[in-house]
Regions:
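Charged, terminal alpha-helix-loop-beta segments
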Residues: 1-177
């Protein structure tokens, strides 16, 4: 059960890693760093030749998550400090973007020498799955404003063809005249 939840959009962290996650989701003692992609992939690849500068976006966000929990940074006065972080990489890929994530982990291990890097902190889903989840929410469990929000999100995802293949349907269900 989650007792506290807050969303922080596009917060810029110039130090220490120069990164701006799309959304920080604060849940009790957990931070979820959401990186959402639509037409572009992650920004940056690898490190500088001397490993002093980290270019890989997911790797920088991983280090940010680690920094936020080890430094006990206060992001909001209603939360004390965080014990763990997760990265949620949201793309329109149909399958897990293996090369993106493997490259980020490889870069982290090269850059972050002497520290443990865990792929268990990195999760992925796609927009199509978000559509499926939203579409299967029970309207009885939602407040009126949530119903409106879900409806608008579903419409947004439909207009961008971010829905899963759902089998064949009979044409007589549609008004084709």
């Amino acid at each position: 059960n989650v007792s506290k939840c807050k969303f922080i959009f596009w917060k810029t962290f110039s130090d220490p890693y120069g990164v701006e996650p799309d959304v920080l989701i604060l849940l009790d003692d957990l931070i979820i760093i959401l990186e959402a992609k639509f037409h572009a992939g992650k920004s940056g690849v690898g490190t500088s030749e001397d490993n002093s500068i980290l270019y890989d976006q997911l790797a920088r966000e991983y280090l940010l998550g680690n920094y936020l929990i080890t430094s006990r940074t206060v992001l909001d006065e209603t939360f004390s400090y965080f014990k763990d972080f997760k990265i949620l990489y949201l793309t329109k890929d149909i399958s897990f973007p293996t090369s993106d994530v493997k490259d980020s982990i490889r870069t982290l291990k090269k850059y972050y020498i002497g520290n443990k890097v865990s792929s268990a902190n990195i999760f992925w889903t796609n927009w199509q799955s978000i559509y499926h989840i939203l579409n299967n929410l029970s309207p009885n469990e939602l407040q009126n404003y949530e119903k409106k929000l879900v409806s608008q999100l579903l419409l947004f995802l439909e207009k961008r063809d971010l829905i899963m293949y759902n089998g064949f349907s009979f044409l007589n269900k549609y008004n084709l005249n």
